[in-house]
Regions:
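Donor-nucleotide binding loops and adjacent catalytic segments primarily
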Residues: 22, 166-239
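A donor-sugar binding/catalytic signature common to diverse glycosyltransferases
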Residues: 97-103, 108, 233-272
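A short, glycine/small-residue-rich beta-strand->loop->alpha-helix junction that serves as a flexible
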Residues: 7-19
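Conserved nucleotide-sugar phosphate-binding/catalytic loop shared by glycosyltransferases and other
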Residues: 9-12, 27-80
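Catalytic binding pocket for nucleotide-activated donors in carbohydrate/polymer assembly enzymes
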Residues: 249, 253-303
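C-terminal amphipathic helix plus adjacent low-complexity
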Residues: 295-354
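A nucleotide-sugar donor-handling region in carbohydrate enzymes
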Residues: 126-189, 206-210
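Conserved nucleotide-sugar donor-binding subdomain of glycosyltransferases
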Residues: 67-96, 101-104
Length: 354
């Protein structure tokens, strides 16, 4: 099967998830071409899984001090370039089109009257229509990267045909060394370090795109972005402080790491993700960098891990086999293999789900 896979490049979480699915698709025998959009080509890293991928400008949201900056977002849109990229992308050689919230591949499929699978956390809004999004946000989420078959990834199904998160396997089992990982790429680095320095009895490993070389600042180890170094730190940490992107939170849940999360203000997906995590008793949420909330969270024990099945392999086989099984059946089968910690199971029951 020949597949075109469009990957949203603005967040490392999208790339991480698609990297996991890329390995599974290759193992399933698929021949896949990848396109990425939304980021300067020089800013991609650890991209071996995508082979000779192509890049496009696409669409992306600009942030400032942890909030969506709509003025800068509008300024960076190159509408004529996007339209040209969509019209020039020939899909005739492909049996299947997949988009992980990537607009060029999705709109090209729409323009050429092709079916398109939308595999992303954002596809959840096609089913749940979150009130946190509002009417305008739901319209944006629907038409940013339109697909014919939305496949929503989520931490729980909420009574819909969603599927669990795709999580890569780890080479070693998780441990706890007492350190706390901090990954808040959309927040001001100075504000982050000022907050962490108020807790000298704890050791923090802070990864941030502004950091170009490793260094120590009191109780804070400042580290540049590196997938391998971050993964090693995640496996051994005693907790993680992050924005509310789907992929990293999913990994932390599967490893049994306690989570303190701050959604990027104005980023609809993250605001809704935070609300879901709170309602499921899976994480602690703060709306802004908050020393009182951090102090409370540091005193919490580590949770038990959430055990999700090998979703990437199941999904890859489902795609390559021609999607003969219904999405509802696939969803039910995957959730039947999912095991939640007792506190989460109790919360799910209290919400009316069995």
């Amino acid at each position: 099967m020949k597949i075109l896979f469009g990957v949203q490049g603005t967040g490392n979480g999208h790339i991480s998830r698609c990297r996991t699915l890329a390995k599974a698709l290759k193992k399933a025998g698929a021949d896949v071409d990848y396109i990425l959009s939304g980021r300067d080509p020089k800013d991609y890293f650890d991209m071996q899984a995508f082979g000779n991928y192509r890049t496009f400008g696409g669409l992306s949201f600009a942030t400032l001090n942890g909030k969506i900056n709509f003025r800068k977002t509008i300024q960076r849109i190159r509408a004529f370039r996007l339209i040209k990229d969509v019209r020039d992308l020939d899909l005739s050689a492909y049996d299947c089109i997949i988009s992980d919230f990537e607009p060029v591949s999705a709109w090209a499929a729409h323009h050429q009257n092709r079916e398109c699978l939308g595999i992303s956390n954002q596809s959840v809004c096609q089913y749940l229509k979150p009130k946190e999004y509002g009417t305008i946000a739901n319209v944006i989420m629907k038409y940013y990267a339109p697909v014919t078959q939305p496949i929503g990834l989520h931490w729980f199904h909420f009574g819909h045909k969603l599927i669990p998160p795709m999580i890569d396997s780890f080479a070693t089992p998780p441990t706890e060394d007492g350190k706390i990982i901090v990954y808040l790429p959309f927040e001001d680095l100075t504000e982050i370090t000022e907050l962490l320095s108020q807790f000298p009895q704890y050791q923090f490993s802070c990864f941030h795109p502004e950091i170009k070389q490793s260094s120590a600042r009191g109780n804070i180890l400042l580290q540049p972005l590196s997938r391998d170094n971050f993964t090693q730190a995640l496996l051994s940490c005693s907790g993680i402080i992050s924005n509310t992107g789907f992929a990293l939170i999913s990994e932390a849940l599967s490893l049994g790491k306690k989570i303190l999360t701050k959604p990027v203000a104005g980023q609809f997906e993250q605001v809704y993700n935070a609300q879901c995590l709170q309602s499921l008793d899976m994480a602690t949420v703060m709306e802004h960098l908050n020393s009182m909330k951090l102090k409370y969270w540091l005193g919490l024990p580590s949770p038990k891990p959430t055990i999700y099945p090998d979703v990437a392999t199941e999904l890859a086989n489902w795609i390559v086999s021609g999607q003969k099984e219904t999405l509802l059946s696939l969803s039910q089968r995957l959730w039947s293999q999912t095991k939640f910690p007792s506190n989460v199971s109790e919360r799910i029951k209290s919400l009316g789900y069995v």
